[in-house]
């Protein structure tokens, strides 16, 4: 079965289309179930017991419980790496990453990539690269991508290539490579071909990386238009924290007086957002330095 359109919609943030496409299928395999349940989680529409008679569905139920309680023990005890599928390992590795156990998350991904040929290995690669970059291990992320491409040679399908290209774009963004060339064009093409909140924010990130203030402001105006803010209200709500974070960066670049107000909005909406947490950490460190050298 060809999953290309489903994966393209998922990774471009077109979640409603993902569910519509999956509903049209006459079968339900682990790949369809994985993307269906991931989409329901993203839309905050997940309900326990949706597919609990299926092992992967059961694992997602445990993952959902973990997201509510932050107690990972039940999920961790029910997944045995030796027998788990790549999709099941993906769920556990995601929980490890959220739990701050980045080394274990990466180890789980690597185990799944190296020991399975079942569907879901490329998804594990993408997650592994995201985790490695989050942990500041850029060289490991690049090595994993290179090894995967070399090992697959001509066996990479179009849907695999979709995830490989996305992984490569993350590495380039993290290392400031091809910011004005291939990586920029990648996000620009995505935003034009699949005009969603996620793709527009991705392109805005590239503009902010280059300090293209006018272009970044143009995307803010686009996302605040009726087409995005009203007709795509569900996505607008979902991506609001990311939008606010980008607006904060833009406000800092322009020297706007709105910075503090935007930070307050983001903190109220998502107090655990990385930008807010890093800002608090830096403020604490600064206060400690001041106190240390205060006469």
Regions found by a protein language model. Give the residues of each.
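N-terminal alpha-helical scaffold/docking segments in eukaryotic complex subunits
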Residues: 1-72, 239-240, 258, 263-295
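Sequence/structural signature of beta-propeller domains
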Residues: 16, 86, 94-96, 101-109, ...
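Residue at a conserved register position within TPR or TPR-like alpha-solenoid repeats
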Residues: 9, 40, 65, 96, ...
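Solenoidal tandem-repeat scaffolds enriched in leucines and small polar residues
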Residues: 112-171, 178-182
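Generic helix N-cap/helix-start motif at coil->alpha-helix transitions
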Residues: 1-3, 27-33, 52-61, 81-91, ...
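Structured C-terminal portions of repeat-based eukaryotic scaffold domains
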Residues: 173-295
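Alpha-helical repeat scaffolds
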Residues: 16-24, 45-55, 70-82, 102-114, ...
């Amino acid at each position: 079965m060809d999953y290309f359109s489903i994966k393209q919609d998922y990774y471009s943030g077109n979640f409603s289309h993902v569910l519509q496409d999956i509903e049209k299928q006459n079968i339900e395999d682990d790949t369809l179930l994985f993307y269906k349940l991931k989409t329901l989680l993203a839309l905050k529409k997940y309900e326990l017991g949706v597919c609990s008679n299926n092992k992967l569905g059961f694992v997602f139920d445990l993952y959902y419980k973990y997201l509510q309680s932050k107690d990972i023990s039940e999920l961790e005890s029910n997944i045995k790496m030796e027998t788990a599928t790549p999709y099941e390992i993906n769920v556990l590795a995601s929980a490890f990453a959220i739990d701050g156990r980045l080394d274990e998350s990466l180890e789980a991904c690597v185990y799944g990539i190296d020991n399975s040929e079942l569907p879901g290995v490329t998804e594990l690669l993408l997650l592994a690269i995201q985790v490695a970059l989050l942990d500041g291990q850029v060289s490991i992320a690049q090595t994993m991508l290179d090894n995967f491409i070399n090992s697959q040679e001509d066996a990479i399908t179009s849907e695999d290539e979709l995830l490989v290209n996305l992984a490569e774009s993350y590495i380039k963004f993290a290392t400031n490579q091809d910011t004005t060339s291939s990586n920029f064009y990648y996000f620009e093409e995505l935003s034009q071909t699949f005009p969603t909140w996620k793709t527009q924010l991705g392109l805005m990130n590239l503009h902010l990386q280059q300090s293209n203030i006018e272009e970044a402001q143009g995307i803010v105006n686009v996302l605040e238009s009726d087409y995005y803010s009203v007709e795509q209200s569900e996505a607008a709500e979902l991506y609001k924290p990311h939008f606010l974070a980008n607006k904060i960066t833009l406000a800092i670049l322009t020297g706007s007086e709105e910075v503090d107000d935007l930070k307050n909005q983001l903190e109220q909406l998502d107090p655990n957002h990385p930008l807010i947490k890093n800002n608090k950490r830096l403020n604490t460190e600064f206060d400690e330095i001041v106190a240390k050298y205060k006469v």
